[in-house]
Amino acid sequence: MQITREKWSKNFSEWFDWVLREGEFYDYGRYPIKGMGVWMPYGFKLRQNIIGIIRNFLDSTGHEEVLFPLLIPEDLLRRESTHIKGFEEEVFWVTKGGSTDLDVKLALRPTSEVAITTMENLWLKSYKQLPKKYYQIVSVFRYETKATRPMIRLREITTFKEAHTVHETYDDAQKQVEEAIEIYKKIFDTLTIPYVLSERPEWDRFAGALHTYAFDTIMPDGRAMQIGTVHHLGQNFSKALDFKIQKKDGSLDYPHQTSYGISDRAVASVIAIHGDDHGPVLPPSVAPIKVVVIPIPAKNEEETQQVMKYSIEICEMFNKNNITCLTDQDTEKTPGEKFYIWEIKGVPIRLEIGPRELISGTVFIKRRDNFKSYTVRKEEAINKIKELLNEIQEDLRRKAWEDLKSRIEYSNDIEKAKKILGNNSGIVEVPWCGSNECGLKIEELTNARVLGYPIEKREVNDKCVICKMNAKTVLRIAKTY
């Protein structure tokens, strides 16, 4: 079968809406509040699997899960002035309890730095309790005024993993930033999501942070999308909330903090990145169903029932070996209709079992990612499926990285950079002197967004595209979500 990616790349927005709807991942646009969608059972299971991977990586590195209230008092949210300025226009406010006006407005959590720091101030008193690493997976709310998009730009972000850590010194906090970056690399690698890692420029840091490091991927339409961020907060929040600890030398001082987050966009990326015109291709590491069995009816009812029995037996064999399998027993739909349904759900492997397989004691296997097919004996099926699931996982990761790298270009000419971005090409790297003035000018002239600069030192033997002074690094720019 020929694999095409025409709709996937050229009409990505329509493709994504179609996949979420027809694949029964997420119902968006019909719940009567803009920017809020409903996770359907199949999509919710995918979300759970992704959250499970995130939890495993955090739990295994000493993070402890907590759960904070949804509401934050206005006076508390305003304690860190730079922070509230960054979020003020996006906050949802609760102003009434029943018909009674509240004395203090309550914010629906846009993020939790001030709320968590408030409680850390009560819990943590000494360097002996540090480092301390908390995380929670919750809904956050942002009053988005731009066009909302399912899973990508929402007013309720339902899968917000935010980690918050406390350290005695700046250097300890920086080590935690480095650990967080490594954790995120492993998470995205397991999810088969490719990325570029950049430090955001000064004018685009998280409100209240000293440094912001961001993971961006490239979606099928060439737009870059932020999928994770890591922030070195320094002492900004601890000072604002008068949070002090006793240090090793006996003195009292403000601790240093970090925070880092991943959202619904991780799920959106998993669905989108490996797709084709048949739908998504879910990596086996998170697919809710790894193998679907499609019974092919025989010419008579008795043999058809035998085929169904054999199909169920094969599927049970996989489930007993921890390979999530489902037999499609719907007798109202044709095999072709079932192929369409399970392809748009992105199930990695399909088994087709008919009279021929029943008689020969074999199974017919088809991969979702490349539609290659194999016939193996029943007793060989477990090992073959395990082998293919590993191959699919690695092939998806490799091809996604190849695609991302092919969409990153270098240009030392601002007009050429603008033209490349106009063709929805992905990310352009331009030589940059390091000044905010030139960086903002690059954004203005290209009508694009600056993603930042590489965190590793990059030798650039070129001139800044704006001021023509010697470049210190490259600045990454892209059309973004």
UniProtKB/Swiss-Prot annotation:
Substrates-to-products reaction catalysed: tRNA(Pro) + L-proline + ATP = L-prolyl-tRNA(Pro) + AMP + diphosphate
SUPFAM superfamilies: C-terminal domain of ProRS (SSF64586), Class II aaRS ABD-related (SSF52954), Class II aaRS and biotin synthetases (SSF55681)
SMART domains: ProRS-C_1 (SM00946)
UniProt keyword ATP-binding present: yes
Predominant subcellular localization, coarse grouping: cytoplasm
Name of a matching Pfam family: ProRS-C_1
Cell compartment(s), UniProt: Cytoplasm
Domain of life (superkingdom): Archaea
Annotated EC: 6.1.1.15
Complexes and interactors: Homodimer.
Name under which the protein is recorded: Proline--tRNA ligase
